[in-house]
Amino acid sequence: MTTFPSAESASCADSFGGSAAPVTVFGPDFPFGYDAWVKAPTGLGVLPAEALGREVAVIGGGIAGLVAAYELMRLGLRPVVYEAERLGGRLRSERFPLPTAHDDGASSDGSSEAVAELGGMRFPVSSTSFYHYLELLGLRTEPFPNPLTEAAGSTVIDLGGETWYAETLADLPDLFKEVAEAWDAALEREFGLSGLQEAIRTRDAQTLKSLWNKIVAAWDETSFYEFVSRAEEFADLSFRHREVFGQVGFGTGGWDSDFANSMLEILRVVVTECDSHQELVVGGVEQLPVGLWNRAVNDSPRWPKGTTLASLHTPRPDPSEASRTGTPRGAVASLRRLADGRIAVTETSGEVCSYDAVLATCQSWLLTTEIDCDESLFSQSLWMALDRTRYMQSSKTFVAVDHSFWKEIDPHTGRQVMSMTLTDRLTRGTYLFDNGPDQPGVICLTYSWMSDALKMLPYSAEKRAELAIRALEKIYPGLDIRSHIIGEPVTVSWESNPYFLGAFKGALPGHYRYNHRMYGHFMQEDMPDSERGIFLAGDSISFTPAWAEGAVQTALNAVWGILTHFGGRTHPENPGPGDRYPELGPVELPE
């Protein structure tokens, strides 16, 4: 657990050089500047005239699918999006249907509504490709109220029945400082964290690769907990220190749910500062994928000015008649390779369409559960990687409250009556969202992973809220949380949804090779024809699962792959990820 400067101080610079430049998600496995590629005025590439207007199936309307579809439309292709539920995927903002305190009967916009972020809710500013699309749509962000941040105001840590109130790390007992110092020192001694981050700041790809490749070879088969338990910085400390580290974590809360994961997975998060400087999207992050669906392109070589993904999905002869009524195709039931080499996509309704290229952005397990997929579309080694992907469970339960009552000061203690809360009780993490004066507030009563999430799985939203409130009442005796709740609770367990089967990937020790196979699948030049034309994207295909940046970067990989598949090319002055992959691609470990 560490304290961090405000997100404003970490805003992304336009140039990358010197220690003043920010840390971004530049690698470390594949140090390619996706943000620079997508922002370049030359564009992502050029298609041959005969390819313009050709259809590409995009399975999944989450952020990976929508980014890819939007960029493919800009290039001049016709994306056909298939979505089983609703646009957004795990960027799902559930709105509480509540009037504002000064409701005059007029409809209110998203900024005045209480929102429960059921999926992605905190977005590190190091995610510069993801933020490119936020900026494109003019969406606002604010610092996320993580523990011990200015945005949270105050934090309560409740462990083993003992409770501490803090506004900074200095307010906590020495035990917590010792844990934070041990973690930071272990990262620096074992991995040279500052050197890795300096290479990222300066975008020195060769230095970064030389450092990171050695780490991959040495640490792929080591778990997060093995690192913590064996590090000499923790060896002189008690088991209690490791226990506190698991319960409280560093930056964003407890990490014991990740103790079984590969240390490489955790190190990537730390090296790229995904664990710090996080922001929320005002009004809900679902505005981003929905906004891309409705955003007009004005620079496409094929589509008239004003064309949107929505208008391409409406039965109108002129796609320039931009419409917000366009809807994606439905859920996909099967994928088949046809005799002519095209790929047939069958919907659950029975409708069949064939395509020269298909992009699957769904969770990889769906290719063997919900979708009857020709085995010949992927190599057996890739099937092994797709099936061995391990998804983590996640549960959240939210309630809307009449106002941000937790900011009130207890006259007896001089402290806020309630705080962002980390605990070993079943709530684990409780987050408080202040929507401003005279506006309803939102409480994420509980955000938990893995076994803690499974405790909630069988129960209704009402029962989950009741269990969480009971736990919080033990931490805040005398505080009447219930009296402030308005409306019904909102909850999610991603593992119970057949179109997700889990919240996000958590790679286990020894999974690097699997990740490498999935991530590099967009490089299809050496593949047999039977495996070409189907592409993969999504955060679980990336090296940074659970972060939207990974979804965006793999979507851009797929865009390059599809561009190349149709005979297109990038601009010489703006090479794409596939152009640099032979030189900078992830290190290959022996099989």
Each language-model region and where it sits:
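Conserved flavin/dinucleotide-binding core of flavoenzymes
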Residues: T2-G43, R342, Q393, A400-V401, ...
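Mobile amphipathic helical/loop "lid" adjacent to a hydrophobic cofactor/ligand pocket
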Residues: T3-S15, V25, P31, A116, ...
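N-terminal Rossmann-like FAD-binding beta1-loop-alpha1 element of flavoenzymes
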Residues: A51-V81
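Core beta-strand elements of the Rossmann-like FAD/NAD(P) dinucleotide-binding domain
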Residues: R54, T348-A357
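Glycine-rich FAD pyrophosphate-binding loop
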Residues: M73-L98, H102
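Active-site/ligand-binding neighborhood in enzyme catalytic cores
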Residues: T202-A331, G341, L366, I371
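Conserved beta-strand-loop-beta-strand element in the redox core of flavoprotein oxidoreductases
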Residues: R329-V352
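Flavin (primarily FAD) binding-site architecture
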Residues: A357-S381
